[in-house]
Design a protein with these regions (language model features):
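N-terminal segment of the mature folded domain
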Residues: 5, 73-251, 262
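Bilobed periplasmic-binding protein/Venus flytrap-like ligand-binding cleft at the lobe interface
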Residues: 225-238, 254-261, 273, 382-420, ...
Length: 660
């Protein structure tokens, strides 16, 4: 229910329908009614696309039906009745206080406050830092400078649990501001002692929605009548949905998700899947997560996932590339993201790496945010001053002052300007228009508690879509180049791959191949560990990895063409089939001619439309052929990763394998 001030309280009840208050019926009956309406809608769509002579009639019937539904909605909402009383426990709207900067900045040296955000809310946090730094501040007689930094939420949670061992004390964050409190829960569950027990301070919200290109949402009526999460997962598993709707050119239903191990939208997708399987999103418990029947249904949901990505920006960048070369539907049908990401996409802002943002003309096919009928989670962007031994009293006080500023009239204006809802649930009017957001959506749900968060995190490796992955490593002579006193490119690559292997579990099929060109023109050594269940072949894989040696030149095009085709031969819709390519140079085959780049890319494109093999590319070192590696990944709908600074290989490869 919307309050008089426009605030929508977080809902904790079970699913609500699309209009007004529901009639008193048992949930199964309501679901059955929805199912029948959906079937009727799809039949109308199919008839409209197949029988031209009935188009006008069907349109008229649809119009009349819409009017009837609208009238029913008005009646159920009590349009003619007195306004309903507000919910008794709904909070009063917040009257945001004015900022209170110091009259004169404190003395130097300034207290430096490092604020670690997620990738998703980094722009908002940077804007808040700029606003705070623009006015004089004085804490304990010292000036203050806020430095925003970012990391993926799951990575930050794990690092915090370990005490940020890879950062010097002066580089560790004073304030942590992930985009959802689930990461605070996860860090605590993993042993973090620096997360204070007090309730964190939310600085703004963004709902996690199902976003679809407008034409696709309209074709199945979801822009008008939002589906339940079960209907979303059912649609994703329906191979003929688009053909039945008159659009066979859109192929299968492609559902995009971020990895729940690192991104909030991925977490929300998993909570929705477990909740839908258990019968209710707001009744999910650690016990229901552990239920074999529930886990089995979630595992079935995950089969419809094309692959996972680390951030929403990764998916949306690919969607924009697909639209520019044809249609966004070639890459995705729907993706689970936050509202702010929809706003960015619709105004022409994309990011290939989640950090560097580019602005181009807005897309022709705008995304439509859909708020599922049985509820959606809300990212609350909580801020906490960390209680680590690296945070002194002055830094803690300055961090608390920054959090105070975020809740002021000036800070909340920045929150709205940055594409988020303020603490009263209000959006900037321009954001609402561009992103097509619902100003006051019904069905908002808080994220689950720590026990559920930890249970879902632990369950994900067992329910995720299984992977079939071939690591393909360039072992040309340049891989012997040193990157430190104790490591060469090749030895560092071996260590990074061995660490990345920990991501895979029994049931994943993983193999290893390498390529160089020998003096006789042969590509060697080729496959050294067949693609097989890593649960039983891990030791053999590691042995083959340790035995790799550099040799000859770089048959890059031949290697990609050969091993992508090999992976395609065993493609299955029940697995994420991929090649992970690591290369430090350019195609160089002086001893024998091989396939050229144009033919290789054409072959990859052909595979992508039949037996899609994702070729993730990783540029390793300053001499890597970045442009070619980017074109390879783009041709297959996969992602390019940058390790041109070879010392960052472990982190980059660790990021890459979250795609599986």
């Amino acid at each position: 229910m919307t309050e008089p001030d426009g605030h929508v309280p977080v809902r904790r009840s079970t699913a609500q329908p699309f209009f007004g208050d529901p009639p008193v019926v048992a949930p199964p009956s309501a679901m059955e009614q929805r199912r029948l309406r959906r079937i009727a809608r799809r039949r109308r769509i199919l008839l409209g696309t197949s029988i031209a002579g009935i188009v006008v009639l069907v349109g008229a019937i649809g119009t009349v039906s819409s009017l009837i539904v609208a009238n029913m909605a008005a009646a159920e909402q009590g349009t003619e009745a007195e306004p309903q009383a507000p919910v008794e426990d709904a909070p009063e709207p917040i009257a945001f206080p004015e900022d209170t900067p110091a009259a004169v900045a404190g003395a130097e040296p300034c207290i430096r406050v490092s604020v670690m955000s997620s990738f998703e809310n980094a722009e908002m946090v940077a804007n808040l830092a700029a606003g705070y730094n623009a006015r004089p501040r004085s804490i304990n007689g010292s000036c203050v400078v806020v430095d925003p930094v970012r990391d993926k939420s799951g990575v930050a949670a794990e690092a915090l649990a370990a005490g940020f061992p890879d950062l010097a004390p002066e580089q560790r964050p004073t304030v942590w501001l992930p985009d959802a409190r689930t990461w605070l829960s996860l860090a605590t569950a993993q042993g973090a002692t620096a997360v204070p027990p007090a309730e964190p301070t939310s600085i703004g919200t963004s709902s996690i929605v199902l976003a679809m290109p407008g034409p696709l949402a309209h074709a199945i009526g979801w822009d008008d009548e939002p589906p339940t999460w079960n209907e979303v997962f059912d649609a994703a598993g329906d191979a003929t949905l688009w053909a039945d709707a008159g659009h066979p050119e859109w192929g299968g239903f492609k559902l995009g998700k971020t990895s729940p191990l690192v991104a909030t939208s991925g977490e929300a997708a998993m909570f929705a899947s477990f909740g839908a399987a258990a019968g209710s999103l707001d009744a999910i418990t650690a016990a229901s997560v552990a239920d074999p029947g529930v886990a089995g249904q979630v595992r079935q949901h995950e089969l419809a996932t094309s692959h996972y990505m680390a951030t929403p920006e990764h998916f949306l960048w690919h969607a924009r590339q697909a639209e520019q070369s044809g249609s966004a539907a070639d890459f995705l049908s729907a993706v689970i993201v936050d509202e702010k990401s929809v706003w960015d996409y619709n105004r022409g802002i994309t990011s290939r790496d989640g950090v560097t943002r580019t602005t181009v003309e807005p897309p022709a096919e705008k995304l439509v945010p859909i708020y599922p009928a049985d509820g959606f989670y809300v990212a609350d962007n909580p801020a906490v001053v960390l209680a680590g031994d690296w945070v002194d009293a002055g830094e803690a006080a300055a961090g608390a002052d920054f959090i105070r500023y975020a809740g002021t009239k000036q800070g909340q204006q920045i929150v709205r300007d940055s594409g988020y809802r303020d603490l009263n649930g209000a959006l900037d009017a321009g954001v609402t228009s561009v992103a097509k957001l619902t100003p006051h959506p019904e069905g908002a749900l808080p994220f689950p508690g720590q026990d559920v968060v930890a249970a879902v995190n632990d369950a994900f490796p067992e329910v995720r879509k299984r992977a079939q992955v071939l690591f393909l490593v360039d072992v040309s002579g340049s891989m012997d180049e040193p990157i430190s006193e104790s490591e060469t490119k090749l030895s560092a690559a071996k260590d990074a791959i061995a660490m990345a292997l920990d991501h895979f579990t029994a049931g994943d099929r993983v193999g290893l191949a390498a390529f160089g060109q020998a003096d006789d023109g042969a590509m060697v050594p080729g496959e050294v560990a067949p693609v097989a269940d890593i649960g039983t072949t891990r030791d053999a894989f590691l042995g083959a990895l340790g035995g790799l040696q550099s040799i000859g030149d770089t048959p890059l095009y031949q290697a990609v063409d050969t091993f992508a085709a090999q992976q395609a031969q065993s493609w299955s819709p029940d697995r994420i089939t991929a090649v992970v390519l690591l290369s430090d140079g350019r195609n160089d085959t002086p001893n024998a001619p091989t396939i050229d780049a144009e033919e290789m890319l054409a072959n990859l494109g052909h595979l992508h439309h039949g037996t899609p093999v994702l070729v993730f590319t990783l540029a390793y070192g300053a001499d890597a052929d970045v442009a070619t590696l980017q074109s390879i990944s783009s041709a297959t709908g996969a992602h390019y990763y940058d390790a041109t600074d070879p010392t960052k290989l472990r982190a980059v490869l660790g990021d890459l394998v979250t795609s599986f």
